[in-house]
Amino acid sequence: MSETFSDVEEMSILQSTKKKIGPTADYDAFDHDILVSINSTFATLFDVCGFGGDKPVRINGPEETWDTIITDPRLEWIKDYVFMKVKIAFDPPSNATLLENYNKQITELEWRIYTVLNDYYPDVH
């Protein structure tokens, strides 16, 4: 039995991010660029919110899964945060209003993630 894309989305950080920004799961020409953007986003989350513990989360390919880095359902916003940051870095909207909207959502998500980490994981900071 083969995996459906929704199965991959639930598991793979790279594949679910690719789905959100456009390329299909089997198209891998931009995987390296997308990985760089994902890892940069995790580094930002580490710097801004303390997410990742002692060091930023880093992925190397489609094997890394969301459930290995997000163990608390209150942190599910991290997925949306990664998708939006990668979208802006990889394929930014040409419409200034849309870009501003993305940036406002990103700022709100940073605050929400920081708040959860600060309230429930104070030793992280």
Kindly give the residue locations of the regions a language model identified:
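Conserved short "hinge" loops at termini or chain/domain junctions
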Residues: M1-R74, W111-H125
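Short, compact, well-ordered microdomains
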Residues: I13-K20, M84, I88-L117
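Amphipathic alpha-helical core segments of compact helical bundles
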Residues: N39-F46, F83, K87, D91
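Alpha-helical protein-protein interaction elements
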Residues: A43, R58, P73, V82, ...
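Amphipathic protein-protein interaction modules
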Residues: I69-K87
